[in-house]
Amino acid sequence: MIYDFLLSLGFISRIPINIKVKAFEVRVKRLPIYFPLVGYIPGILFFFGGSFENFLLKILFLILGYYFFDLFHFDGFLDTLDGFLNQSSKEKRLEIMSKGDVGPFAVFFGTLYVVVFWTLYLEIPPITFIYSSVFGRYSMNLLMFFSKPAKKTGLGALFFPFQKKNLLFSSFFLLPLLFSMKYFFISYVVTVVFSYLMSIVSNSKIGGVTGDVLGGACLMTNGLLLVVLGVV
């Protein structure tokens, strides 16, 4: 369990994990189980940052959370926006996403996301960041459960065929968040609904999901939950 968790941590963050992997193609399909568990780490960083009154400490924890975790998904978020909002064929959208060039859609919505995140970081209860970070990573499992790979290569394709039992196993890591039934219920419903809708959109745009889409969905769910939990 610890071995797989560390591999999962290294897979969806910038934290270097130097572990020799045996039977990689088999083991990598188990990694999504631990995605929600990984989400507790940036969630706790943002929680502490939001709890401190000192402005410099707020900045420090924000940088740590983004540098080691959220920036990893922010890249996918930007690529997904540029690809999905481009009025062209599925093949062209996939090409745009694979190139990774930052286009106007990515610049605008990426900037908007950061501004909204920063505003909420200063205003809403810090505990909401734990919920949003954990459920944001959980959304990647839901998206894989609902969808299929858009192409046969790439990081996203490694997890397919997605083992349905992994969704159940990963759900156990949500249980500590039951201490607030209201936040848990809202987070769960929003995450499931958004992930399902995202799978429909992604299938329509590019014929499935990619690693960029998974990362983008994680960040979109994260931001959406912060907005929703911040107003309830």
UniProtKB/Swiss-Prot annotation:
EC numbers on record: 2.7.8.26
Gene Ontology biological process: cobalamin biosynthetic process
Subcellular location: Cell inner membrane
Domain of life: Bacteria
A cellular component term, taken from the record's GO annotations: plasma membrane
Recorded topology in the membrane: Multi-pass membrane protein
Presence of keyword NAD: no
Keywords: Cell inner membrane, Cell membrane, Cobalamin biosynthesis, Magnesium, Membrane, Transferase, Transmembrane, Transmembrane helix
Reaction(s) catalysed by this chain's protein: alpha-ribazole + adenosylcob(III)inamide-GDP = adenosylcob(III)alamin + GMP + H(+); alpha-ribazole 5'-phosphate + adenosylcob(III)inamide-GDP = adenosylcob(III)alamin 5'-phosphate + GMP + H(+)
Class in the EC hierarchy, top level: transferase
One of the record's GO molecular function terms: adenosylcobinamide-GDP ribazoletransferase activity
Pathway membership: Cofactor biosynthesis; adenosylcobalamin biosynthesis; adenosylcobalamin from cob(II)yrinate a,c-diamide: step 7/7
Residue stretches spanning the membrane: 32-52, 54-74, 102-122, 126-146, 172-192, 212-232
Cofactor: Mg(2+)
Pfam hit, one: CobS
Function text: Joins adenosylcobinamide-GDP and alpha-ribazole to generate adenosylcobalamin (Ado-cobalamin). Also synthesizes adenosylcobalamin 5'-phosphate from adenosylcobinamide-GDP and alpha-ribazole 5'-phosphate.
Family statement drawn from the similarity comment of this UniProt entry: Belongs to the CobS family.
Protein name per its UniProtKB record: Adenosylcobinamide-GDP ribazoletransferase
